[in-house]
Structures are given as structure tokens and as C-alpha cells.
Amino acid sequence: MKQLTILGSTGSVGTSTLAVVRENPDRFAIKALVAGRNVAVMAQQCIEFRPAYAAMADEGAARELRILLAENGIATEVMAGEQAACELAALDDVDQVTAAIVGAAGLLPTLAAIRAGKQVLLANKESLVTCGRLFMDAVQQSKTQLLPLDSEHNAIFQSLPESIQRQLGYSSLESHGVSRIVLTGSGGPFRTTPLEQFTAMTPDQACAHPNWSMGRKISVDSATMMNKGLEYIEARWLFNASAEQMEVILHPQSVIHSMVRYTDGSVLAQLGTPDMRTPIAHAMAYPQRVNSGVEALDFCRIGSLTFAEPERERYPCLYLAIEAFDAGQAATTALNAANEVAVAAFLQEQIRFTDIAAVNQKVVERLSLQEPSCIDAVLEIDRQAREVAVGLVKSLHN
């Protein structure tokens, strides 16, 4: 039986991971849960799964959780803070760590799991978008097995030879007969919206994703295709891919989650119902398979699968991300930080939908930054980029 620590247990990926555990109680047990400040959900999770440890982001939330668990007779030891999260990610008797804390808060706990040699199920985008080289070097040094949880990266992983799966980030695609990785994206809710209407698009319209159920921030990222841009950056690191070995295409049905082209003309693809439990179950049980609880794909109901090329004028954020990777880690870090500020401002109706790309581009252009050599340097770039982005948002809002 695998012992699990889940970093970010109350979020979308965390709750989906626990749903897979619920389907397979004879294969997985929860050793530790880590979350932010959602005490109510964490209490329910502790009552159901009885972890030995739980950690909250701060002492106030931890105190509330202790009271709730004591009232229910649950003996889980409750901790608080980033150091506690790092300790629970590196526990001796933990086999697998799900890294699903969103944002910079997930960097150090994820790195702690890698350095402890755990099998790491990676959902934290920032680990690779802002710290790709640092993280992949740590993976190689610790001989950790990294398993991607994003549906697209998991699809690519499943479509690659086992020899690459076992040496993620350091194998040569070319020497294994791989010619290109094809990253698919739905194109979001504005795929067919006339461009002249973009300035009038509202947060609610941007968050109405046609296929996936997601949080508001990532829904906006889907509408701008910044999410695909960030996934492109992650894929370059995860699969040691050059720009020439990457391809991004629109696939509105979200059934093919990504593909791999081989030199002999073959294309391997992973298909499935759009549900995060599928890639999570695959990674949790790898190299075996377990029940995820997901409904089987009905090909007759789908009818047809279509593809198109993403237009630059419709999806400028996608191309900003592609160009940022070639500019370096400082640029991808700055872009990610700027985008978080811009999307938050759009969701609060402080700027227009089209301003998101404008803010992102100006931040990357204005900052003159050195390549980061440690996480502190990454966090400083992140801070500077946010500062500039906030100033730009204010100038647009006034």
C-alpha cells in the first residue's frame, strides 16, 4: 500500500486525488494533508481519511482545525506554516507526494519532496515555469521519479517510450524516434467570438469553459490561452524538448489531451473524458492501472474531432509564453507573475479582457533581469514583476 502526502488537498487537484484514493482504499493510504486556510474542507478530509498529520498555511487556521478535529475525536497532529509543509513532504514513510499547492507557496514543499527522493506527482505549474532548471537539476540529483498530473503533460507522458518516462527531462527525444510533441487546447470560450468584441468580454463569459470544470483564474487563462503557454513552458522542461520539437494546436472537443509524433510517421495520442481523475489515477498507480471512477469515453456521442491552428491576434498570451521560454527563466517568471496580477484585475473588473495580454507584454519588456540561480532570486523577480504589473493595472483602471 502506498503512503501519500497531498500538498494542496483542499483544491481541485487535491480533492480529485482523494476521490481516486476513495475508489482504491486497498492501494492508497493518506499519511499527511497540507492546505491553505480552508479549515472546513480540511476537517472533513481528516475525518474521512484519518491522516497522521495535517498542516495549514498559518497558526490561526491550524488552531481552528485542532478544535474541529478534537470535537470529532480525530487524533491527527495539526501543524502550521511552510516549514511544516516541507517536513510532511519529506516524511520517511511517505512513498508519493502530490504537489498541488497553487503558486509560489508550492515551490519549497515540492522541492523538499524532490530532495527527499519521493515519487512526485506534479501539478504545481510554478515549479517549472519559474524554476525549471533548478527543479530538473534537483530531480536528476535525487533520482526522483517525476509524474505529471496536468492532463496534457500526462497524455504526452503516456504517449512516450518507457525509457523516456523513466528519465524525464534528460532523455533525447530524437534518439528515441520522437519528432514532435503536440500540445492540444480547446481554445476556450472565445474561440469563435469576433475579435472586435473582445474588449467587451466579461469575467463571467471568460469563465464559462466549454469542456472543463475549473477555477476562475485558470478559466481566464484558458480564454487567453495563457494556460497553454504555461503548459508549453512546462513541456519544454519536462520532456527536454526544443522549440522545433513542440507544436500547439486547437482541439475544441478536449478529447485528445495531447499527442506525440514519431519519425516513422506514427502519431500516438491519449484520449479520455475531460476529468482530472484520469491523469491523477494514472500517475498514482504508475506503471499499473486502477479505477479512477471516470465515465468511459463514448465515441459515438462525440461524433467528430476537429483541429485548427491558434491565431496570434486571438491568443497573444500563448505566443508571449512561447517567446518568454527562449528569453530565459527570468522572462517566464516575470510573465507568470504579471499574468496573475492582470487576471486578478480583470476578474475584479478593473481592466478589460484585452488588457491582460497588454500588461503581460509590457512587464516582460520593461524588466531587465538576470537569470535566477536560486529560489530566492526567482521570488525577487516575481516580486518586481508584480510591482510593475500593479502599476500598469492602476494606470489602465484610472
Curated annotation (Swiss-Prot):
Homodimer. It catalyses: 2-C-methyl-D-erythritol 4-phosphate + NADP(+) = 1-deoxy-D-xylulose 5-phosphate + NADPH + H(+). The lineage of its organism: Bacteria, Pseudomonadati, Pseudomonadota, Gammaproteobacteria, Enterobacterales. It is an enzyme of class 1 (oxidoreductase). Belongs to the DXR family. GO terms for molecular function: 1-deoxy-D-xylulose-5-phosphate reductoisomerase activity; manganese ion binding; NADPH binding. This is 1-deoxy-D-xylulose 5-phosphate reductoisomerase. NADPH binds at residues 10-13, 36-38, 124, 126, 215. Its cofactor is Mg(2+); Mn(2+). GO terms for biological process: isopentenyl diphosphate biosynthetic process, methylerythritol 4-phosphate pathway involved in terpenoid biosynthetic process. It comes from Serratia proteamaculans (strain 568).
